[in-house]
Amino acid sequence: YDTDENDQDLTVITNTHDRTGPKGSITITKALDPGNLNMDVGDPTFIFTLTGTDVYGKKHSYEKKVKFTKAEVEKQMKDHPGDLIELSVTFDDLEYGTYTCNEGGMIKYFKLLNITSNSSNATIDQEKETVTFDIGPTGMTAKAQLTGGAKFMNQMIQGSVKLIKKDSKGKSLRNIEFVITSSDGAEVAKAKTDSDGEVTFDGLLPDTYT
């Protein structure tokens, strides 16, 4: 069957996705509270993985990391006292499509508190600890935007130590003071035993305590 573009029975389908247009980008920021940070565990390093499918059906996967060195932490604390410490990465040259970001790394010492975003094309799932973006020109989908961003806020996992004081006969001793010191010799906390001879120190950051 020979076709003619002027044939009224012929339907011509045109792909409206222009590959020559500007591509998308997503910026992810990692935020830490300097008041809840112990650099003795090493430089906190977090890995962000961005996966998605573009409008042509092709799957994509990207990975970037941020590393909080001691020098960087000290600089930010000096320049912006009292503020959160933040580092960002940007995924550039993204084809139009839907992309989801999650994080990894340092799970032994840190937990994710929350994900926030001011981007209208972002959908956050706090339970799954992910954020999804619709990347494309305005109007391509109901939420599409060329750029997007989100912030992952983390907190160091805190532990506790329970101490029990008894005499040689096994009797619980009350009002016995214990002092907890960190690996650098600094006093972290002190408290006295209760009527059961017990004392608990909560809110301890990862470290070696004496």
Feature map (PLM): residue ranges:
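Solvent-exposed loop/turn and edge beta-strand elements of beta-rich ligand-binding domains
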Residues: Y1-T210
